[in-house]
């Protein structure tokens, strides 16, 4: 962590890289239409693609946090309900450098053109841009003095999926996720639900 509470992440995949199609099949036995599957890219891409395809076929909403940043096969996007890249990941997915607000909007449109209905591009202290069913809008970040940025994105994605699973619309869930992510910045740990509510 640097003097501005920004972190650098090093991934030692270990057991994550052993997750395979049989593991996915076991997990999907427990899921049903309307459930939410949240994934990232610290498991084999082949497993991500398989899980997305199978879950989509079952009516499960698949949310992909494309971290760590890498290019992805275009066919994956049509099996996703939503993709939630940060600025760097969004640039990697599209090849478009984000220099201003108009670029963020353009990148969100580009990602949707790949086949996914919903995109949330997280922008740190600038909040996030949501593109939902062809309409874009922004959610401001809650202003805090960061202590540790570790897991802010994970917290955002987890809270977002909790909100959606509890029946919130995407905007409501994103506001809750933004609040949770902001709270995660002011402690050296992720926020608990009671802390989020208070």
Task: Say what each PLM segment does.
Residues 1-35, 53:
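Conserved N-terminal subdomain of the carbohydrate kinase-like
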Residues 2, 35, 42, 79, ...:
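Conserved functional loop/turn residues at catalytic and ligand-binding sites
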Residues 6-9, 35-36, 61-62, 81-82, ...:
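Structural motif
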Residues 1-2, 10-13, 40, 65, ...:
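Short beta-strand segments
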Residues 194-198:
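N-terminal low-complexity segments that are often proline-rich with Ser/Thr-Pro
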Residues 10, 93-95, 184:
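Residues that scaffold the ATP/ADP-binding catalytic core of kinase and kinase-like folds
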Residues 70-76, 101-189, 193:
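Conserved phosphate-binding/catalytic region of the ribokinase-like
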Residues 24, 36-106, 127-128:
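Conserved beta-alpha-beta core of the PfkB/ribokinase-like small-molecule kinase fold
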